[in-house]
Design a protein with these regions (language model features):
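Intrinsically disordered, compositionally biased repeat/linker segments
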Residues: 1, 294-307
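Low-complexity, glycine/proline-biased repetitive segments and flexible coils/loops
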Residues: 2-30, 36-294
Length: 307
């Protein structure tokens, strides 16, 4: 029997439109989806790794892992966009935004993870002071003739290798970025020279193109060393040894921190930049009057409210 809602059979069901919704999280929180959302695009960037220090050519910090599901764009490590996240409408989802790794007087600390709906981006690897490479979302740059840290598949690239020839001919490797490997010190090493971090990945999920997850630059040895540039996307440049603290990665980009030479033994590597999580709920279209899903039909018939 037709009800009084314009001749439509069933419970009152007014038309509704749900436009696209974009939410940016610069710190951890909760995403509450719009009522008719069923899928979501995302860009999830972890915290960047800190640069190394006092290593006679310390490595730059690796960028935080970069994962994205924006159609037509890239994820990190040369991967294509991931599948859209499946979500439910009017539901809360925890968002974790990773902190950047802290700068120290030796190996840079690794960045922290960022996550949404079981999608986790790995923190960037710290830049090396001495010894083994530091893996991460993107790997940290090396120091003292070691290979750069390895990046995580689908998130970022390796850090650059270093070379130690004694004297001033030492150079750390640049931190890996989301779109390219950190630059390695050549053999033989050039005098007093640092090397750039790898570039990050650009996304237009917010409507404007922004590059994130660049690796930190390394440094050479001694006061006149040429510093390595930070990778595009928040990576910090390496520091000259006369600076007591190296440059930090840009906040909310997951950029790696810069390496600090520390010929005086007291320097501190640059901190990694914090991460970011961006969620886009696509336009859900126009829900017309007189259309119900099967759950609504069942619930109303069971309750005796279907007319």
């Amino acid at each position: 029997m037709a009800s009084s809602n314009g001749g439509i059979v069933g419970v009152d069901n007014p038309p509704v439109a749900q436009p696209a919704v974009i939410t940016t999280f610069n710190s951890s929180g909760t995403l509450t989806t719009a009522p008719y959302t069923t899928t979501a695009q995302y860009v999830i960037v972890a915290g960047g790794g800190a640069g190394g220090a006092n290593g006679n050519g310390s490595g730059g910090g690796g960028a935080g892992g970069y994962r994205a599901s924006v159609p037509g764009e890239a994820s990190g490590g040369g991967a294509s966009a991931e599948s859209l996240a499946s979500v439910s409408g009017a539901t809360g989802y925890p968002i974790v935004v990773g902190a950047g790794g802290a700068g120290t007087t030796s190996d840079g600390a690794r960045g922290s993870v960022s996550s949404f709906n079981s999608v986790v981006s790995t923190g960037g690897g710290g830049g090396s002071f001495v010894g083994p490479e530091k893996p991460g979302g993107s790997g940290g740059g090396a120091s003292y003739s070691t290979s750069g840290g390895s990046g995580t598949s689908g998130q970022g690239f390796n850090g650059g290798a270093s070379k130690y020839n004694g004297g001033s001919n030492n150079g750390g490797g640049g931190g890996g970025g989301a779109s390219e490997v950190g630059t390695s010190c050549p053999t033989p090493a050039l005098p007093q020279r640092g090397y750039p971090g790898g570039d990050g990945v650009a996304s237009s999920i917010t409507g404007s193109s922004v590059t994130r997850a660049g690796g930190g630059g390394s440094c050479g040895r001694f006061e006149n060393a040429v510093i390595g540039a930070g990778g595009a996307g928040g990576g910090a440049a390496g520091a000259n040894p006369v600076s007591s603290t190296a440059n930090a990665g840009t906040a909310n980009t997951g950029g790696g921190g810069g390496g600090e030479d520390g010929a005086n033994g007291t320097g501190t590597g640059g901190a990694g930049g914090s991460g970011v999580v961006i969620i886009k709920e696509p336009d859900a279209g126009y829900r017309v009057s007189g259309v119900w899903d099967m759950n609504a039909l069942y619930d109303n018939v069971k309750a005796g409210t279907w007319v």
